[in-house]
From Swiss-Prot:
Organism: Paraburkholderia phytofirmans (strain DSM 17436 / LMG 22146 / PsJN) (Burkholderia phytofirmans)
A Pfam family the protein falls into: RecR_C
Family per record: Belongs to the RecR family.
BP-aspect Gene Ontology terms: DNA recombination; DNA repair
Keyword field contains tRNA processing: no
Name used for this protein in its record: Recombination protein RecR
The gene coding this protein: recR
UniProt keyword annotations, A-Z: DNA damage, DNA recombination, DNA repair, Metal-binding, Zinc, Zinc-finger
Length: 198
């Protein structure tokens, strides 16, 4: 039996989400239609509202409902520090630590030549203009520690250093509460190389 085209379209739309395969998308679609029509309508309205009202901040490129986001407008922040992250979700995680009080630039991705993502796609020119405004003194590269994140950090670091900016990278090592026997060898090696005096 062929499913209705409206249901097929819903399944395909849900499959576009990261980590959602065909079976999960189908289960979600059937659940929404069978058991939670109100939730489905609320989800649809929320998605529509978000797509109509969210835009990119003119300064840092994160999501905002205004031209400039609250972080960029916050005069209590250190305007000489610029932290570069891959996604708005990464920015939120850093904010939750309450340890960083500078400004941000959100790349909305990372370099991945095999996927056709180059400097243009991660808004590299905008980042360089922002970092070269004469106020920024240090750029903190907080890209993820994946191969693509490392390549992105290396590329950005080389380019920004050539413009006379101080560039730092997030430290990495054993997670808080982590036991060495459960931590991978690469992480332990990095923690050993980046050790500090006490």
């Amino acid at each position: 039996m062929k499913q209705p085209s409206a249901l097929s379209a819903l399944v395909e739309a849900l499959r576009a989400l990261p980590g959602v395969g065909p079976k999960s998308a189908q289960r979600m679609a059937y659940h929404l239609m069978q058991h939670d029509r109100d939730g489905a309508e609320k989800l649809g309205r929320s998605l529509l509202f978000a797509t109509e009202h969210l835009q990119h901040c003119e300064k840092c490129n994160t999501f905002t409902e205004a031209q400039i986001c609250e972080v960029c407008l916050d005069e209590e922040r250190d305007p000489t520090l610029l932290c570069v992250v891959e996604t708005p979700a990464d920015q939120i995680m850093l904010e939750q630590t309450m340890t960083y009080r500078g400004l941000y630039f959100v790349l909305m991705g990372r370099l991945s030549p095999l996927d056709g993502i180059g400097p243009k796609e991660i808004h590299f020119d905008r980042l360089v203009r922002r970092a070269s405004d004469g106020v920024i003194k240090e750029v903190v590269l907080a890209t993820n520690f994946t191969n693509e994140g490392e390549a992105t950090a290396h590329y950005l670091g080389q380019t920004l250093k050539a413009r006379g900016l101080a560039v730092t990278r997030l430290a990495r090592g054993v997670p808080v509460g982590g036991e060495l026997e459960y931590v991978d060898a690469g992480t332990i090696a990095r923690a050993m190389l980046d050790r500090r005096s006490m």
